Design a protein with these regions (language model features):
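Non-catalytic terminal/interface segments that mediate subunit docking, oligomerization
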Residues: 249-359, 364-374, 473-475, 490
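Glycine-rich ThDP/TPP pyrophosphate-binding loop and its adjacent helix/strand module
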Residues: 73, 108-266, 271-279, 283-288, ...
Length: 553
């Protein structure tokens, strides 16, 4: 295998184009070996193999610097920079994260996992290079889907006006984000593709950037030629290449959305080799709720920043929603502000995404929603330890980040009935005062009778009256609270009080004062971080008193 002899990009340069094509095949075998066994980002990596080879063939990494947007398409880059064991040796899979990581290699310059950041980061590298009087090439690599993010567009604007030196932006255009692209700029990209880059309506040139187009984005020889044209250029330039997402695996080529990311699967059939059970799930429950809600309530509208699958909205469900569905592209700030406007006008918006991405819209939540008290409902998935995949995709900071924003009601359901009741209450026509953030449970589905009305804010619910110890178990951790209560009764001989707080954004002070009569310890359980988290509210409340508080995360 030629790849056995490639331990750095320098080793790549001695091979012919035909041999490099063999290397591309070998890289895809490495991708298959890893992804069939542990899963990961499939389509982005299979579609960018040839471009990665050409980039490393033409440029001189790490002296020349690559910044991969999201970096979920960097697996081939890792194989060519001394990390191929993480793809061919099953025992070493854990050595390579799913994203670029400077701790792994001198060829990686940033920990990246969120989208639309590469152009700004690379622009900073270019400016720093110029200040220090250096001469290397700086290359940002970004997918067409990521261009919908405001940070990417802002950085392109800055590059076109503020930089007069080497700066290369490779736009990997596979005509797809995770789902289909949304936004007017994609009409411009299509016009450029259809005209082989010659359309006069060119947004990149409008920003003051040079531009070159390459239709054959999966042809190594063509890519080498175009990258050689821009190497050592003395002006910012966009290299727009047209690639095929999922190239090399027919199932992925036909279903770009479904194969953006994969679980372990059988290569011959494409079927998952892991079982998720046949029972109900909160994801399935959510998508069903949204579709039925839209059918019954024409004032209801779903807003998502390119993450419809975060709540199980596949192509079929999105088609059913019709005009009651808005995909803003990767634009969390715009999504939240748009939802605030929808709510102010009298309709009922539901913003859906993953918790790790909502933090990008913190200012809009605080300013455009909460200060204005617009009744926007935000529904977040992966807001717990469930589903954590990398340091860049942690949802566990959400409670600390959002529960302290004035006027925001944060609800943490502990059962299916409670979850649906909270959605119903938040989206009810009578509920016009409160912005609401609801965390989708990450546990297996559990069932328990639930209240229908949450107008009495911050009212906790005592599920089991007891003594001495009060267990306050939030959301996903309520099941753990039940287990702790049972263990205390069995081992200590008394029944503790078990409380389902439901609200994470405030305290039930009346209930907490009542606990002081016959309890000596309050134990809080939460799915988040300690500092600034839910439990610290109780430590602060009981600070002047004798009550002991134990916070467990």
């Amino acid at each position: 295998m030629i790849l056995d002899n490639i331990n750095s990009p320098k080793d790549l340069k001695k091979y012919s184009v035909s041999e490099l094509e063999t290397v591309a095949d070998e890289i895809r075998e490495g991708l298959f070996n890893r992804l069939t066994k542990i899963g990961g980002h499939f389509g982005p990596n299979f579609g960018f193999v040839e471009a990665t080879i050409a980039l490393h063939y033409v440029f001189d990494s790490p002296n020349d610097k690559f910044v991969f947007d999201v970096s979920h398409q960097a697996y081939a880059h890792k194989m060519l920079t001394g990390r191929k064991a993480g793809y061919f040796d099953d025992s070493r899979f854990s050595e390579d994260s799913g994203y670029t990581n400077p701790d792994e290699s001198e060829h990686d310059f940033f920990n990246i996992g969120h989208t639309s950041t590469s152009i700004a980061l690379a622009l900073g590298l270019a400016k720093g290079r110029d200040i220090l009087g250096k001469k290397e090439n700086i290359v940002a690599i970004i997918g067409d889907g990521s261009l919908s993010g405001g940070e990417a567009l802002e950085a392109l604007s800055v590059a076109g006006s503020e930089l007069n030196s080497n700066f290369i932006v490779v736009v990997n255009d596979n005509e797809q984000a995770i789902a289909e692209n949304h936004g007017g700029l994609y009409k411009n990209l299509k016009a450029l593709r259809d005209s082989n880059g010659k359309s006069e309506n060119n947004m990149f040139r409008a920003w003051g950037l040079d531009y070159i187009y390459e239709e054959n984005g999966n042809d190594i020889a063509s890519l080498i030629a175009v990258f050689e044209k821009v190497r050592d250029s003395n002006r910012p330039v966009v290299v727009h290449i047209h690639t095929q997402k999922g190239k090399g695996y027919e199932l992925a080529e036909k279903d770009k959305e479904g194969w953006h990311w994969c679980v372990p699967f059988d290569r011959a059939t494409g079927k998952p080799t892991v079982s998720f059970g046949s029972g109900e799930s909160y994801l399935g429950m959510t998508s069903q709720y949204i579709v039925e809600k839209a059918k019954k309530d024409k004032d209801f509208v779903v807003v998502t920043p390119a993450m419809p699958m975060s709540v199980g909205l596949g192509p079929e469900e999105r088609a059913k929603l019709g005009s009651q569905y808005i995909d803003t592209g990767i634009a969390e700030e715009a999504a939240v502000a748009i939802a605030s406007g929808i709510a102010r006008r009298g309709a009922k918006p539901l913003v859906v995404t993953n918790m790790t991405f909502l933090q990008r819209a913190y200012d809009q939540i605080s300013q455009d929603v909460c200060i204005n008290k617009t009744p926007v409902t935000m529904l977040m998935n992966y807001s717990s330890f469930d589903g954590l995949t990398d340091v860049t995709h942690l949802g566990i900071f959400g409670l600390a980040a959002f529960t302290n924003i004035p006027n925001l009601v944060v609800l943490c359901p502990s059962s299916a009935e409670e979850y649906i009741s909270m959605l119903d209450w938040s989206l009810d026509s009578k509920q016009k005062e409160n912005p609401v953030l609801i965390l989708i449970p990450g546990n297996d589905v559990s069932h328990r009778p639930a209240d229908k009305d949450y107008d009495d804010l911050n009212r906790f619910k005592i599920e089991q009256k007891g003594e001495k110890v009060a267990i306050i178990a939030l959301g996903d951790f309520f099941q753990k609270g039940e287990a702790v209560a049972s263990a205390i009764k069995e081992k200590c001989g008394f029944a503790p009080t078990l409380i389902n707080p439901r609200f994470a954004s405030g305290l039930d002070e009346e209930l907490l004062h009542g606990l002081e009569k016959n309890h000596q310890l309050v134990l809080t359980l939460e799915d988040g971080i300690l500092e600034g988290g839910f439990g610290q509210k109780f430590a602060s409340f009981y600070g002047p008193d004798k009550m002991l508080v134990k916070i467990t995360v």
